[in-house]
A protein has these predicted regions:
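Positively charged n-region of N-terminal signal peptides that target proteins for export
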Residues: 1-5
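Bacterial N-terminal signal peptides
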Residues: 9-17
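Bacterial lipoprotein signal-peptidase II cleavage site
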Residues: 18-31
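Short, glycine-/small- and polar/acidic-enriched structural segments
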Residues: 28-161, 165-168, 177, 184-190, ...
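Short, solvent-exposed loop/beta-turn-alpha elements that line the ligand-binding surface or hinge
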Residues: 61, 134, 210, 276-284, ...
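Pocket-lining segment of extracytoplasmic ligand-binding domains
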Residues: 87, 93-95, 124, 162-257
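Secondary-structure end/capping motifs
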Residues: 225-301
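Conserved C-terminal helix/tail region of periplasmic/extracytoplasmic solute-binding proteins
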Residues: 292-316
Length: 316
């Protein structure tokens, strides 16, 4: 009887030891540092949640390092993505189509929430879109900016071929040329659009008014396959930043946002924060509208459906 009791005690001790060792192994495994993610952003409000997440330490809380690279033009951003200098980027559906058309696979992992406005210069004497015929509009060609410009102009029953588009890829340069009267109008993202308004520009229309926003977050196929846990961590941090933005006033974070994003100082008095929501996916309808525009301009002949060029698993 005593032998049986001793044997039982020994078994229990060994079992506890094994469980303890297993727990330690699991703990050590789960605490392994995640790989670094590098993402590209533009000078717009789509980037704000990522800047907040980095500054407030939300990425670190999720066990991830995120390097944020700032770009002034979509072409520079796309070149960096193709060269492997960044893993993902705040982008748009047009770029996704172009990348995949050229056999460089990228995946949409969520939509982004920015705002774009068509602004007329202070001395242009343009107060409505109908007066844009024969006038110059600063854009970046074959990007979300040109897409939105066309949609905005056509919403007023104006033939977009009757306006003079001027390709100005770098957004700060476009803003400067508008303010200096070198172009009559420009399509700009917020918060730079509000900067133009504060300088005397006038809002003719906006993506918000039309209810369209083809902005998306994308990652390369390699990143999606090799950094899935890191991307999930990024989105958990992103949602923490959204909560912060909903609860805090801009005065509490405007200083470091101006510094980190490279926004002009005038943004301090004009920043209007969108009503951000937790990470979610774009719709099939939004993709179809982009494809129709691209096909009309003979920029693609391919048909895509959202599930083939996206991965929603990171935000679930």
């Amino acid at each position: 009887m005593k032998k049986n009791i001793l044997l039982l005690v020994l078994v229990l001790i060994l079992s506890i030891g094994i469980v303890g060792c297993t727990s330690e192994v699991k703990k050590e495994t789960s605490s392994q540092p995640l790989k670094t993610l590098t993402i590209g952003v533009m000078p717009d409000l789509d980037s704000l949640p990522f800047i907040i997440a980095e500054h407030n330490g939300y990425f670190k809380e999720e066990g991830i390092q995120v390097k944020i690279e700032h770009f002034k033009s979509a072409s520079d951003r796309d070149t960096a993505l193709q060269a492997g200098k960044i893993h993902g980027a705040i982008s748009d559906m047009l770029s996704v189509v172009f990348f995949n058309d050229n056999k460089f696979e990228v995946k949409i992992t969520s939509k982004t929430e920015g705002s774009f406005k068509l602004i007329s210069g202070k001395d242009s004497n343009i107060s409505k879109i109908e007066q844009s015929v024969g006038k110059t509009i600063g854009i970046s060609k074959n990007t979300i900016i040109e897409y939105l410009t066309d949609r905005i102009v056509e919403s007023s029953k104006i033939d977009v071929n009757l306006v003079k588009k001027v390709a100005i890829p770098k957004i700060p340069t476009r803003l400067e040329m508008l303010n200096n009267g070198k172009i009559d109008m420009a399509t700009l993202p917020e918060p730079l659009a509000s900067t133009a308004i504060s300088a005397g520009g006038k809002v003719l229309s906006s993506s918000d008014k039309l209810g369209i926003n083809p902005g998306v977050m994308i990652f390369t196929k390699d990143a999606v396959e090799s950094k899935s846990e890191e991307i999930k961590s990024l989105y958990r941090a992103y949602n923490k930043a959204i909560k912060f933005l909903k609860e805090e006033k801009p005065e509490s974070y405007i200083d470091f946002v101006i510094k980190e994003a490279g926004f002009p100082e005038s943004v301090r008095n004009t920043l209007t924060v969108p009503n951000y929501s937790d990470a979610s996916m774009p719709t099939e309808k939004e993709l179809t509208e982009v494809l129709n525009w691209l096909k009309t301009k003979k920029l693609t002949t391919n048909n895509y459906i959202l599930k083939d060029i996206s991965n929603s698993s990171f935000i679930k």
